[in-house]
Amino acid sequence: MPSGYTRNMLVTHPHPLYAAQANGCLITDADGQTRIDWVNNFASLIHGHNKREVVDIVAQQASRLLSATMPAEWEVRLAELLVNRISSVDAVRFMNSGTEANLIAIKAARAFSGRSKVAKLEGGYHGQYDLLEASYLPRPEDWGDRSSPRVIAHNAGTPQSLLDELVLFPLNDIPTMREILTRNAKEVGAVIIDPIGLSLGSGVYAELDFIEALREITKKLGMVLIFDEVWSLRTGYGGTQGNISVMPDLTTMGKMIGGGLPIGAVGGTHEVMSVFSVENGEPPVKHSGTFTGNPMSMAAGYTAMSLLTPDAFDGLARQGQRLSDGLTRALQDTGFSGHVVNRGSMTNLLFTPHMPKDYRELFYQQTPEATAVSRAVQALLPEEGLHVLRNMFVGSTAITDDHVDASVEAVERALRRIKEGQGV
């Protein structure tokens, strides 16, 4: 394996930590060190590790049917659960990852709208589809004018012809967003956004009036609005869209809806989802996959999601607030400049002088000093008993108040060590 592992986001030196076992909110590495897990496999383990009900149903299902070319009952049950829970979703299709869900959603939106171009946030993250990963982390010399941001490939070898199919707009700038979408109205058929904001640990969140304005203009221009809730579905019983009462045309999902096993899903209105239907002959969008809707992921997902009651989400929100309050105190007590941003079970620790409103503000506030502190905290937290990536804390129902308080103390210890010159 190049560099010794399969996920570049896990880069640590001189080598990554290898997991050996885990239970609840505790994960133990190959050297026998146990830490509180605030990553939860990139937000997919909302009940933590080895949730008994999920493990039991997976074991039962494994003895009956691992996978098959035919659909199974679990697929129907999970689809019904998602339709009943998410207000904008009338129908669902399953796949195997959030990246795949976004790719299929774009296909559906293009087929429905008859337009090929896609619009997304500058700095927005939507998985590894090469169209959507463009301009995820662009640098200032590549940005171009704010009113017409340049599209920059994220990986070498991305065809220019593909990049030409993407349009960018800034977060939390309603006039510029409206102008860009209106200017490209004849070509853009899909607009995709994580309703939280830039997502993936950035801590830069969308303002409600921006999301409302985006819904209004996309409806006016006949564009399919896609909410990427692969991460943000965990912020509430009906996802982020349920929290803010803004309904998209399509929703993409993944991570927690699989109960810890691989999964992705696209859900939406009957009108848009009809592009997958075979009832009237050959469908506009042909969608299939070897492991799509496999009964193992469906069973694990249905069981995990059934345990996520409104009370469970209330508990996760209280957990996130307790952590947020504690981290804020830790910053104040140690004299560091920074902010703590919380949305439900996701909490970000930012070492910026001000709260950034979009990608460009975030970039400019990541000064060498702020970046050094952020990296030092990230490097010291494993030594203090925490598993955290990018200073983003992703909670689970397995984490107790005692775990939260211990985590706050660990962060404060790391900050004090940095004050003493360690880790920087």
Residue ranges and their predicted role:
Residues 1-424:
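Conserved N-terminal phosphate-binding loop of PLP-dependent enzymes in the Aspartate aminotransferase
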